[in-house]
Amino acid sequence: MEKKTYSYDEAYNASLEYFKGDELAARVWVNKYAVKDSFGNIYEKSPEDMHWRIANEVARIEAKYPNALSSQELFDLLDHFKYIIPQGSPMTGIGNNYQIASLSNCFVIGLDGNADSYGAIIRIDEEQVQLMKRRGGVGHDLSHIRPKGSPVKNSALTSTGLVPFMERYSNSTREVAQDGRRGALMLTVSIKHPDSEAFIDAKMTEGKVTGANVSVKLDDAFMQAAIEGKPYTQQYPIDSANPMVAKDIDASALWKKIVHNAWKSAEPGVLFWDTIIRESVPDCYADLGFRTVSTNPCGEIPLCPYDSCRLLAINLYSYVVNPFTPEAYFDFELFKKHVALAQRIMDDIIDLELEKIERIFEKIDSDPESMEVKGTERHLWEKIYRKSGLGRRTGVGITAEGDMLAAMGLRYGTEEATEFSEKVHKTIALEAYRSSVNMAKERGAFEIYDAEREKNNPFINRLKEADPELYEEMKKYGRRNIACLTIAPTGTTSLMTQTTSGIEPVFMPVYKRRRKVNPNDTNVHVDFVDETGDAFEEYVVFHHKFLTWMKVNGYDPDKRYTQEEIDELVAKSPYYKATSNDVDWLMKVKMQGRIQKWVDHSISVTINLPNNVSEDLVNQLYVEAWRSGCKGCTVYRDGSRAGVLLSTKKKDKKEEEECRCKPPQVVEVRPKVLEADVVRFQNNKEKWVAFVGLLDGRPYEIFTGLQDDEEGIVLPKSVTSGRIIKSYDEDGTKYYDFQFENKRGYKMTIEGLSEKFNKEYWNYAKLISGVLRWRMPIEQVIKLVSSLQLDSESINTWKNGVERALKKYVQDGTEAKGVKCPNCGHETLVYQEGCLICKTCGSSRCG
């Protein structure tokens, strides 16, 4: 039977009704989570369809085991994102037969044993790409690569060090599209590695390592030496008793560099590695393949090579009864029941993931390539399949911590609020582990469970002290899952739960947005006119749960409030002095450390700081994070991303301002030869290529065409730049050739670019080239291209490819005027490294 499909408008309008008029939540759901095929057909009308899809699939797995949950019971937990929310890949992929992809949100890879050869480095590169094409975020560690200058037995004679390979892995990430996005990558290195300083500095140079997050693994000895001003020994190999390279460094100086770079550019993040390993339950089985080596891209799941994790969030706000009233209380009994069910659902999702990997095997085996070509991907998924089934790792987390505290009448960041949060997370830990023990009775423990191995683990002993009976049950029956808990970022999840994100406080309870209006329309109130003459009306937006507080306390949400009245409202609410800008940052770090004691994996938190904070504050926050028992920490200083060095040449302020304000010169007569970049993109299922002609480093013209077809452009994949040459026939007809150097240094020419292109696309490309030639600002060209109303689906996807090709030329820090952040709704998007990054909430959108 043919499945019913829906138009975008049908799905959007149904979702808008589902989310009670929340446009942002509706668009996020339709764009990211509704089931679609590769032709863009939409098979789900609203999140209700999605929740039945997930409930039916999980119920199918439940039926294999005793005491099975029904589809209806599961649906009731998922409906309206009220209690339990599978995050990201599980939400998209469970029951979705239109894509062959993993359900895992994150992976870590890395070869066993001596893996510093060129072959090993390239193998990791290939594995990284294979995972990213199946929707996975990937992390891996570089501590195994020899430091720069080390002797090697090849024609180079000495090692290049790890920085060139950072760039390689970063570039691979940028190549891979996951549903229109770049891949996500975390690169880590031990501070003990002699090249760690170069690693820490790698992203401070313009355009370098733009496709990866970087974090440095800090041990306790380094932290102690940095604080006390003592020397610290770096060596390679980092764990060797007889290192081939060793040197003493000034720990304080390197620590200051870490702090400075984090203050300047928000990276590197820091991972307190001794804390991670000491607290890690899976590392009790390190000799059996569960030695933690790196983390996923957001840092909340430290993992061993070829292990993976799936994420789920419990909506804490939904357990507050009578929210925002003096009678408010937290329903711990219902909460305990649901935590147990969340752990159970996550175990079911592991079975669903193993089925998905079996489909990946079938796809690889049916591909026409030889096993020599596809063997790496097959072997990679075999290792992941084995490790996933062996440990059965889960990632049960939370969202809406900030709203939960406000609904209870507690102010985020106070001692009273932190104590309550600690109680909630202790409850999660005990009930998730109790559920895992009960599943061990019904379904069997994870294969290598051994109570003797875990007896000295601090996390396990915390559980033992809190609930001795649970510990004895675990010793007797084992546990279903090697590790259970995390706290991950919940960006789009919290948009759909309509709550605060993760364990974060509310960003702002009330803020203003602008919408464009026609000043000639009746009943229009014009509050603002921009420099182009466009008129805007300002309107107040209330955070969803602040709106609930208003209604509970008798304030009319439909009234038009003055700013003074809004300030008075906020001051009366539990959100007062509890926003991300108001919260005491040191107290927030201490809160993270206290909650971390009840989370067996890690917590992903970014401390958002105003632009004017000092480096000393960043130093204090990082040191406090280490002392408080946090496993990692990241800071983001407002505006710091745009503040990364744009070039290695220094300019004084006056020169910088002149450069920024001076418009590029219009050159009406095109030079005979222009330098050019090559940008590849997908147009539906076809591979296309764009040639972007550059004048003074700015796009001057663009040619696009089908790549590798019989009449199209045959161009080696290694070619990323060249020259576009304008010439004339004897009759005066002009034509354009593309010239590049091949790997052997010979000039190769592709003749007649304009003759190789479909005339329909050619005309649009001429239009775009025309506005580029007259030096319209690139961000405005992108806006123009985006606004083209085109009927053909192919033309529209081509248009999107052209937008992506041009975005890389927008100067970092340029505002995307009139464009709202899909995450927080603010018009605070700036271009950074070809991506749009929100200065308000830090979310990014690439491609």
Predicted regions and their residues:
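Short Cys/His-rich micro-motifs in 6-15 aa windows
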Residues: 842-847
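Terminal amphipathic helices with adjacent charged low-complexity linkers/tails
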Residues: 218, 279, 284-286, 296, ...
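Short, cysteine/histidine-rich loop/knuckle motifs that typically chelate Zn2+
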Residues: 822-826, 840
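Internal maturation/activation junctions in enzymes
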Residues: 74-75, 235-237, 338-385, 389, ...
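Function-dense linear segments that define catalytic or interfacial modules
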Residues: 57-64, 77-154, 162-165, 176-179, ...
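Short, Gly/Pro- and small/polar-rich lid/capping loops
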Residues: 471-473, 647-694
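Catalytic alpha/beta core of large soluble enzyme barrels
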Residues: 23, 299-301, 350-354, 460, ...
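Conserved, charged catalytic cores of large soluble enzymes
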Residues: 2-71, 154-168, 178-290, 321-326, ...
